[in-house]
Every structure is written in structure tokens, then in C-alpha cells.
């Protein structure tokens, strides 16, 4: 028995999406965002769907693909300091259930948004660019890659 040690992960960022109820909470948060946007007067339903998609994808991009490091003191000699949250998730193992969920969620939201905006050209272009912005960094080939040196340090 190790006295004075906790039974937690070395880096809590690696397992946060595997916590109980986190997927349901995530979907409910997206639904809540959509309902709040729907309650704004004089905003049409297609605009609300596009705003829901854009806000979700912007938040996902910022929190998963630009913020690096961990808010915890980790004994990994600073390895997590240079990794984004997406790269830390599940210890960098690709194609886990959490990664699949976070990859499929913006795609489903994109399909819903495209349907409810009736494939309007402006909405379609905005939503497609937004989707590509969050899907491309999730590709396994881009694990640890910094395009043009952006977010290198």
C-alpha cells in the first residue's frame, strides 16, 4: 500500500470524457445552447441552427485543439505541456469511444443544421467550413502536427 498517494490518473485530462454521464451532459449542453438561442426574439430558425453549430464548433476547436497543457501538476516531466487536450485524451490512443463520440457529434449537428436551414447556400458554406475546421485537426495523421508552426509553443 502506498501511503500518501492518490488513486487517480497521472494526467486527469486523459480520462475526462470517459466519466459517467459526460456524453449525456455534453448533448444536453448543446440542446440547452440551442434552446437559449431559440428564445432570442426576431432570430429565424435557420439562423439559430447555424449559430448553434458555429458556437459548438468554435468552442470545440478552442478547448480541444488550441488549449495546451493541463491545469494539474503532473509527474510526466512536462510532456503534457506541449499537447492539446485532444492529443492527451485517452493517452493518445486513436479511435477510442470518446474520440469517436467527439468526432461524430459535430457531423450529426452539421447534418441537422443543413436539414433545418434547407441547404441554403450561405448557411451551407459557413457550416461546412466550420465542420472542416473541427474535423481536420482530429485526423490521426495530424496528431502532434502544428501546421505553419501555429500553436507550436
UniProtKB/Swiss-Prot annotation:
GO terms for biological process: ceramide metabolic process; motor behavior; myelination; negative regulation of B cell apoptotic process; negative regulation of ceramide biosynthetic process; positive regulation of autophagy; positive regulation of protein localization to nucleus; regulation of ceramide biosynthetic process. InterPro entries: ORMDL (IPR007203). Disruption phenotype: No overt phenotype, although knockout mice show elevated brain levels of sphingolipids, including dihydrosphingosine, dihydroceramide, ceramide and sphingosine, compared with wild-type animals. Double knockdown of ORMDL1 and ORMDL3 show elevated brain levels of sphingolipids, compared with single knockout and wild-type animals. At 8 weeks of age, both male and female ORMDL1/3 double knockout mice weigh significantly less than wild-type mice and exhibit impaired myelination and motor-function abnormalities. The triple knockout ORMDL1, ORMDL2 and ORMDL3 is not viable. The keyword RNA-binding does not apply. GO terms for cellular component: endoplasmic reticulum; endoplasmic reticulum membrane; serine palmitoyltransferase complex. The chain crosses the membrane at residues 22-42, 43-63, 95-117, 122-142. It is a multi-pass membrane protein. The modification Hydroxyproline is found at residue 137. Residues 118-121 are extracellular. When hydroxylated at Pro-137, ubiquitinated via 'Lys-48'-linkage, leading to proteasomal degradation. In endothelial cells, ORMDL3 proteasomal degradation is controlled by the sphingosine 1-phosphate receptor signaling pathway. Residues 1-17 are annotated as: Important for ceramide level-sensing. Keywords: Endoplasmic reticulum, Hydroxylation, Membrane, Transmembrane, Transmembrane helix, Ubl conjugation. Pfam families: ORMDL. Residues 1-21, 64-94, 143-153 are cytoplasmic. Plays an essential role in the homeostatic regulation of sphingolipid de novo biosynthesis by modulating the activity of the serine palmitoyltransferase (SPT) in response to ceramide levels. When complexed to SPT, the binding of ceramides to its N-terminus stabilizes a conformation that block SPT substrate entry, hence preventing SPT catalytic activity. Through this mechanism, maintains ceramide levels at sufficient concentrations for the production of complex sphingolipids, but which prevents the accumulation of ceramides to levels that trigger apoptosis. Ceramide-sensitive subunit of the serine palmitoyltransferase (SPT) complex, which is also composed of SPTLC1, SPTLC2/3 and SPTSSA/B. Belongs to the ORM family. This is ORM1-like protein 3.
Amino acid at each position: 500500500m502506498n501511503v500518501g498517494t492518490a488513486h487517480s490518473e497521472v494526467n486527469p485530462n486523459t480520462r475526462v470524457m470517459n466519466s459517467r454521464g459526460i456524453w449525456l451532459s455534453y448533448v444536453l449542453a448543446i440542446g440547452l445552447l440551442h434552446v437559449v438561442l431559440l428564445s432570442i426574439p426576431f432570430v429565424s430558425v435557420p439562423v439559430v441552427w447555424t449559430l448553434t453549430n458555429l458556437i459548438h464548433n468554435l468552442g470545440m476547436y478552442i478547448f480541444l485543439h488550441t488549449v495546451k497543457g493541463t491545469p494539474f501538476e503532473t509527474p510526466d516531466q512536462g510532456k503534457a505541456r506541449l499537447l492539446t487536450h485532444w492529443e492527451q485524451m485517452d493517452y493518445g490512443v486513436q479511435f477510442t469511444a470518446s474520440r469517436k463520440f467527439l468526432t461524430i457529434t459535430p457531423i450529426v449537428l452539421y447534418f441537422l443544421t443543413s436539414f433545418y436551414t434547407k441547404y441554403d447556400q450561405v448557411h451551407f458554406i459557413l457550416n461546412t467550413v466550420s465542420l472542416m475546421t473541427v474535423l481536420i485537426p482530429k485526423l490521426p495523421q495530424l496528431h502532434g502536427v502544428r501546421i505553419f508552426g501555429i500553436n507550436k509553443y
